[in-house]
Amino acid sequence: MFKQILGKLPKKTSAKFWDNGESQTLDNNNNQGGGDEVLSQRTSSNGDTSLDCVSSFDVLPRLRDVSISEKQELFLKKLRLCCLVFDFVAEPQQNFKEKEIKRQTLLEVVDYVISSGNGKFPESVIQEATKMISANLFSNPHRQWKNKTPEALDLEEEEGSLNPSWPHLQIVYEFLLRIVASPNTDPKISKKYIDHTFVLKLLDLFDSEDPREREYLKTILHRIYGRFMVHRPFIRKTMNNILYDFIFETGKHSGIAEFLEVLGSIINGFALPLKEEHKLFLTRVLIPLHKLKCLPNYHQQLSYCVIQFVEKDCKLADTVIRGMLKYWPVTNSAKEIMFLNELEEILEATQLTEFERCMVPLSRQIAQCLSSSHFQVAERALYLWNNDHVTNLVRQNSRIILPIVFPALEKNGSSHWNQAVKNLTENVLKVLSDTNPDLFEECLHKFQEDQQKAEDTKKKNGETWRQLEEIVASMAK
């Protein structure tokens, strides 16, 4: 990724920097970098690094052009320079040269982190690095762009807006990723600066509409969770709170899929037996996430998290299946197919004992899916019988399950409008007939009796209505 960023750089930049619209030309005689100079900002006494507070600039050499003893101090100066934040939203056409100089400086500090030796970064480096990262990632100018989206725009139908500050932000994210992942970063020192406040602000950025930004954040959060064990409970708790707010309050958040992808890795690392707090997370967060209408945006990641729980503790299968039945979509066929896909994967990890606890309500729901006029829903439900494990669970409980699903299958075979559904239904009926012929005949006989009773009742009701109509007609005369 870093090589791709480097490849986009122009070979040379101008040595002119603008300060509030007034140009300052550098004296090339003072250039210590052989034409590749970088500018150092002088800030106000209160440390403000906004563009309005910059008064003058000094020429800085390249890191590769100074001695080893000077590199660290020069690196710190470059980090301070990179704290200067440009407004790409309000002033997109201004300060081109300055923006490019900062971009090159950012690339240089990233390269310094990558190529640094085996020595640990001192506290001063970590402190200045987190200051620079905070100034760029958490600054208002970089966040104003997301409010530019018209209110009438349906965000669920859009791929997301792209952050205009990305030429700088991308490299800052790369720098943060390299710092966090570097073996030269000591977590014991870094946790003082990459603290709860820093992590909380980082998690808030997941609501960015830019998918490139969310992808970086996902990778960085993975690294922070892996290296900073002291922050793990806080990260899980904060993610829970964000998901609670999404489920029960707002219903809108751009980074749910990325959150769940990180959580999938976290769940995968849970030790057995599962803690009660982890089981509560399943029942209070993951299962209710199925009810939102934007489920397609994150269903793949959600399904993975849920299945991880069932694979770790098969006793949770009953809880998960009943939870899914509670939120089963009624009028959304696309979501119904997603539920059936997830259900099959859950059943794959379900043992017989847990299956028997929920098989009656589950069979009723599957029967409704079999009866669906939407052919894809009916097809997906029929495909469950292609799964050997599911078929085995059904076979061992055929006395209870077959009477529930048989009417739907028989009606499909005779009256469904879609020929593919009819063909699949015939195959399933043949499998059920071969598995338990006697029970199959019983179900068929009962179905025919019920059909005859329904027909007789219909005729009787029709005759009753006819007599009532005659009585009313005679009274009218």
From Swiss-Prot:
<dbReference type="GO" id="GO:0019888">
    <property type="term" value="F:protein phosphatase regulator activity"/>
</dbReference>
<dbReference type="InterPro" id="IPR002554">
    <property type="entry name" value="PP2A_B56"/>
</dbReference>
<dbReference type="InterPro" id="IPR016024">
    <property type="entry name" value="ARM-type_fold"/>
</dbReference>
<dbReference type="InterPro" id="IPR011989">
    <property type="entry name" value="ARM-like"/>
</dbReference>
<comment type="subunit">
    <text>PP2A consists of a common heteromeric enzyme, composed of a catalytic subunit (subunits C), a constant regulatory subunit (subunit A), and a variety of regulatory subunits such as subunits B (the R2/B/PR55/B55, R3/B''/PR72/PR130/PR59 and R5/B'/B56 families). Interacts with SRK2E/OST1.</text>
</comment>
<keyword id="KW-0963">Cytoplasm</keyword>
<comment type="similarity">
    <text>Belongs to the phosphatase 2A regulatory subunit B56 family.</text>
</comment>
<dbReference type="GO" id="GO:0005737">
    <property type="term" value="C:cytoplasm"/>
</dbReference>
<protein>
    <recommendedName>
        <fullName>Serine/threonine protein phosphatase 2A 55 kDa regulatory subunit B' delta isoform</fullName>
    </recommendedName>
</protein>
<comment type="function">
    <text>The B regulatory subunit may modulate substrate selectivity and catalytic activity, and may also direct the localization of the catalytic enzyme to a particular subcellular compartment.</text>
</comment>
<dbReference type="Pfam" id="PF01603">
    <property type="entry name" value="B56"/>
</dbReference>
<dbReference type="GO" id="GO:0005730">
    <property type="term" value="C:nucleolus"/>
</dbReference>
<dbReference type="GO" id="GO:0000159">
    <property type="term" value="C:protein phosphatase type 2A complex"/>
</dbReference>
<dbReference type="GO" id="GO:0007165">
    <property type="term" value="P:signal transduction"/>
</dbReference>
